[in-house]
């Protein structure tokens, strides 16, 4: 079991009546290509109790029931550990959630989104805990899924960027990607994310820098927020005894200018929520200037500016975007020790394109079969309810 020990970054414990026992909540899943939809589910689950434990499945279990994961289990364990609402991570959690698992970790109940998770033979993985009344449901985040993100990478369009309409080509692909012929269901597929100020408020800490804290500024795309970003931010966080890390996120068009192709894969609003969910980040500047200006440094009272080992592309006028912090002597290059980049993730996906598309079609076929079985069961008279899936 991996325990998170970053104090307020993990969410302060809520004081309650002294006699009240802490409510322990269980979540589990693959958490492959972690995005703000996963983070939002964990945020909602954490709000239902006092202590959140998250079980993460192994590569072997995922391959058996769903298909090949994009990230290794070690990468996925660390990604979940970095989400600020998570108190503990349980590696190698069983794919089917049982009462034995809940009891082993002293959890009162488990929480899952209002979608369906099925085993390789088409059974509900939460069947046992549902029947025992130890299952709670939270609202699934609309507009984001691993299926959608994979589709964006494979189609290579810019339709998902924040200032552009969805093209007819992307809409057609979004409607069909990973779909099994002859039907579709509400759980697998693509929909558009609608950003609201309330969602940002829910993810933000709302905490201002305090006296004695070191304000550290980092900037970039933080696209497909991944373990490489986490390792970098963890190193940055460890540079000060009391760090306050501000992440500046560039506009989509700015990212596309220096990255090219159809980058960023996630638009600015989506990237904002992904970064806000990280326990090492205190604040996000939405649409930060590419060059770190004197105005920005003075406004946020920045003590230190950090950049990783990736190449620094000159600004449009040919200047060094870190010229001002270097002039002030507050620039620091940080080696995260992790070479993973968004480009490498996209390469993993493209290399295994057929496997991922087949995985999504297989997943939806199971979900449709389950839906139909449930529909038939509900249509039968009570005395005949004995449906064998």
UniProtKB/Swiss-Prot annotation:
GO terms for biological process: phosphatidylethanolamine biosynthetic process. The modification Phosphothreonine is found at residues 341-342. Keywords: Lipid biosynthesis, Lipid metabolism, Nucleotidyltransferase, Phospholipid biosynthesis, Phospholipid metabolism, Phosphoprotein, Transferase. GO terms for cellular component: cytoplasm. CTP binds at residues 221-222, 229-232, 259, 307-310, 336-340. Gene3D superfamilies: HUPs. The keyword Ribosomal protein does not apply. Pathway: Phospholipid metabolism; phosphatidylethanolamine biosynthesis; phosphatidylethanolamine from ethanolamine: step 2/3. Its EC number is 2.7.7.14. One of its GO terms (molecular function) is ethanolamine-phosphate cytidylyltransferase activity. SUPFAM superfamilies: Nucleotidylyl transferase. It catalyses: phosphoethanolamine + CTP + H(+) = CDP-ethanolamine + diphosphate. It is an enzyme of class 2 (transferase). Pfam families: CTP_transf_like. InterPro entries: CCT, Cyt_trans-like, Ect1/PCYT2, Rossmann-like_a/b/a_fold. Ethanolamine-phosphate cytidylyltransferase that catalyzes the second step in the synthesis of phosphatidylethanolamine (PE) from ethanolamine via the CDP-ethanolamine pathway. Phosphatidylethanolamine is a dominant inner-leaflet phospholipid in cell membranes, where it plays a role in membrane function by structurally stabilizing membrane-anchored proteins, and participates in important cellular processes such as cell division, cell fusion, blood coagulation, and apoptosis. Belongs to the cytidylyltransferase family. This is Ethanolamine-phosphate cytidylyltransferase. It comes from Bos taurus. The gene is PCYT2.
